[in-house]
């Protein structure tokens, strides 16, 4: 099986990478979730927010905000992530399609 070609950004706002990081809360078993989006060319953090839950709806809202804030045009950007639920959920994918953002996912390890 052939490996996919690596993603290479030649300038800012071409490829963003994002993930959700679990952060311990003040109470045992309580977590907060850091949503962080970074431009892979410039390493600029284009947005970060902390929430009390992890969801594809929140992910979609953040991407919509970022694209408006950064004035991203349809077909301009690739958004790379792992294969987590909030990254591949129907709401998130529909938002990406509406915005003209191309999703990219890490290859699953079998």
How does the language model describe each region?
Residues 1-110:
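Charged DNA-binding/catalytic regions of mobile-element recombinases
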